[in-house]
């Protein structure tokens, strides 16, 4: 019954005499079914009138300030269409993977994106193999022109040269010899030198 739930919050804020009056009115309305229907209709009409009045006031306010189009909301651009074309998804976007090409800043070649980093290493001479080759070149140059190069560097005339000639971090003497197959198997714990 909607009539019994509505006056409960208002009763708590009112004085005790008003609560008694509301309770007495409620008991009278619930005793007679004819009055109960009348009270329910009055409550329904009151709620409907409040809702309609609220909407009317809101529309009137929006019209006065010029925002009546805001009541309509944002119009959809077009209905969503499902695309049924091969090699396209339902939205019409291609599903085929596109090869992305990058331009090398050093040699201006087009290179696939997956191969760009290795190409750039080789192109600029900064990869592992390139640095080994460059180190070997420096080592051979040091051996042939060590006397002329050292007098040039120590005189302080290294204006345009690189800093690589003075590096002590690499030496060709420190290379380890590769172990042979025989030397690895001689001390092995697997067969202790026994043949089966």
UniProtKB/Swiss-Prot annotation:
GO terms for cellular component: cytoplasm; DUBm complex; nuclear pore; nucleoplasm; SAGA complex. Its main location: nucleus. The keyword Aminoacyl-tRNA synthetase does not apply. It is found in: Nucleus, Nucleoplasm; Cytoplasm. The modification Phosphoserine is found at residue 172. Residues 182-196 have a biased composition (Low complexity). It comes from the Eukaryota. A zinc finger (SGF11-type) spans 102-123. The keyword Magnesium does not apply. Pfam families: Sgf11. Keywords: Activator, Chromatin regulator, Cytoplasm, Metal-binding, mRNA transport, Nucleus, Phosphoprotein, Protein transport, Transcription, Transcription regulation, Translocation, Transport, Zinc, Zinc-finger. Coiled coil: none annotated. GO terms for molecular function: transcription coactivator activity; zinc ion binding. Residues 142-153 have a biased composition (Polar residues). InterPro entries: SAGA_su_Sgf11, SGF11. Residues 140-196 are annotated as: Disordered. GO terms for biological process: chromatin organization; mRNA export from nucleus; positive regulation of DNA-templated transcription; protein transport; regulation of transcription by RNA polymerase II. Component of the transcription regulatory histone acetylation (HAT) complex SAGA, a multiprotein complex that activates transcription by remodeling chromatin and mediating histone acetylation and deubiquitination. Within the SAGA complex, participates in a subcomplex that specifically deubiquitinates histone H2B. The SAGA complex is recruited to specific gene promoters by activators, where it is required for transcription. Required for nuclear receptor-mediated transactivation. Binds independently on SAGA to promoters in an RNA-dependent manner. The long N-terminal helix forms part of the 'assembly lobe' of the SAGA deubiquitination module. HAMAP family: Sgf11. Component of some SAGA transcription coactivator-HAT complexes, at least composed of Ada2b, not/nonstop, Pcaf/Gcn5, Sgf11 and Spt3. Within the SAGA complex, Sgf11, e(y)2, and not/nonstop form an additional subcomplex of SAGA called the DUB module (deubiquitination module). Interacts directly with not/nonstop. Interacts with the AMEX complex component xmas-2. Interacts with Cbp80; important for promoter recruitment of Sgf11 that is not associated with the DUB module. Belongs to the SGF11 family. This is SAGA-associated factor 11 homolog. It comes from Drosophila persimilis (Fruit fly).
């Amino acid at each position: 019954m909607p009539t019994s739930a509505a006056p409960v919050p208002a009763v708590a804020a009112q004085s005790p005499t008003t609560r008694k009056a509301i309770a007495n009115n409620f008991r009278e309305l619930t005793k007679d079914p004819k009055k109960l229907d009348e009270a329910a209709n009055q409550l329904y009409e009151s709620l409907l009138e409040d809702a309609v009045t609220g909407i009317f006031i809101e529309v009137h306010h929006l019209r006065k300030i010029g925002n009546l189009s805001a009541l309509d909301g944002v119009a959809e651009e077009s209905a969503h269409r499902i695309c049924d074309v091969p090699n396209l998804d339902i939205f019409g976007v291609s599903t085929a993977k596109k090869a992305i090409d990058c331009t090398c800043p050093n040699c201006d070649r087009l290179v696939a994106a997956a191969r760009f980093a290795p190409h750039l290493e080789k192109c600029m001479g900064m990869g592992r193999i390139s640095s080994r080759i460059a180190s070997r070149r420096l080592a051979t140059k040091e051996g042939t022109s060590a006397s002329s190069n050292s007098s040039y560097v120590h005189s302080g005339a290294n204006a345009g040269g690189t800093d690589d000639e003075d590096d002590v971090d690499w030496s060709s003497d420190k290379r380890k010899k590769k172990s042979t197959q025989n030397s690895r198997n001689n001390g092995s714990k697997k067969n202790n030198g026994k043949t089966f």
